[in-house]
């Protein structure tokens, strides 16, 4: 069983913000498998899917971004999923919009959702898919940028990368993180 976690913030006011692109990837995966999200045994929404004979839980924490670790640990414990079987999908403002980067492990890199997951797990060795939301952000408050909505032009780019992110996550499910990294990482990320 694999666990694919998309990070974001709950509440309608956060829909379609840069910070919620992880949620959008999970929604795309649920759409691809024609399933809806249900409330889990913890503070998360999830769906169970099967891809090429492999069981997958796709999950959206219903905590705020900086408390995402609680939902991840609850799902891991409930479904008995080891850390090696997890992929976390999150936004990254240091990667250009339209680019993605997969890693087998690493630091939080300033992403508070990842930071809390690392804190709760006590380790950094879980796979992550970072979705670029733009290097060309204005100087000043990063929080207002990541919590802001995409411009019309940016939205088109974001919408075009979401299916690729879902495909990369499914590649991880079938072939593992190394294969997904080799297939989907781009030089400009």
UniProtKB/Swiss-Prot annotation:
Keywords: Cytoplasm, Hydrolase, RNA-binding, tRNA-binding. InterPro entries: Pept_tRNA_hydro, Pept_tRNA_hydro_CS, Pept_tRNA_hydro_sf. The record marks 91 as: Stabilizes the basic form of H active site to accept a proton. It is found in: Cytoplasm. Its main location: cytoplasm. SUPFAM superfamilies: Peptidyl-tRNA hydrolase-like (SSF53178). GO terms for molecular function: peptidyl-tRNA hydrolase activity; tRNA binding. One of its GO terms (biological process) is protein quality control for misfolded or incompletely synthesized proteins. Its EC number is 3.1.1.29. The record marks 9 as: Discriminates between blocked and unblocked aminoacyl-tRNA. It catalyses: an N-acyl-L-alpha-aminoacyl-tRNA + H2O = an N-acyl-L-amino acid + a tRNA + H(+). TRNA binds at residues 14, 64, 66, 112. One of its GO terms (cellular component) is cytoplasm. The active site is at residue 19. It is an enzyme of class 3 (hydrolase). Monomer. Hydrolyzes ribosome-free peptidyl-tRNAs (with 1 or more amino acids incorporated), which drop off the ribosome during protein synthesis, or as a result of ribosome stalling. Catalyzes the release of premature peptidyl moieties from peptidyl-tRNA molecules trapped in stalled 50S ribosomal subunits, and thus maintains levels of free tRNAs and 50S ribosomes. Belongs to the PTH family. PANTHER family: PEPTIDYL-TRNA HYDROLASE (PTHR17224:SF1). This is Peptidyl-tRNA hydrolase. It comes from Chlorobium phaeobacteroides (strain BS1). The lineage of its organism: Bacteria, Pseudomonadati, Chlorobiota, Chlorobiia, Chlorobiales.
């Amino acid at each position: 069983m694999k666990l694919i976690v998309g990070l974001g913030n709950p509440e309608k006011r956060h829909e379609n913000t840069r910070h919620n692109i992880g949620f959008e990837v999970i929604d795309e995966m649920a759409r691809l498998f024609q399933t809806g999200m249900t409330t889990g045994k913890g503070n998360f929404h999830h769906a169970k899917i099967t891809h090429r004979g492999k069981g997958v839980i796709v999950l959206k924490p219903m905590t705020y971004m900086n408390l995402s670790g609680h939902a991840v640990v609850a799902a891991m414990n409930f479904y008995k999923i080891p850390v090696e079987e997890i992929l976390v999908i999150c936004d990254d403002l240091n990667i250009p919009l339209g680019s993605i980067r997969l890693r087998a492990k690493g630091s939080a890199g300033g992403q508070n959702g990842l930071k809390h997951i690392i804190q709760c797990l006590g380790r950094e060795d879980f796979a992550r898919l970072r979705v670029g939301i733009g290097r060309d952000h204005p100087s000043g408050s990063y929080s207002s940028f990541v919590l802001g909505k995409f411009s019309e032009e940016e939205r088109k780019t974001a919408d075009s990368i979401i299916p690729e992110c879902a495909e990369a996550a499914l590649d991880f499910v079938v072939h593992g993180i190394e294969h997904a990294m080799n297939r989907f990482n781009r030089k400009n990320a």
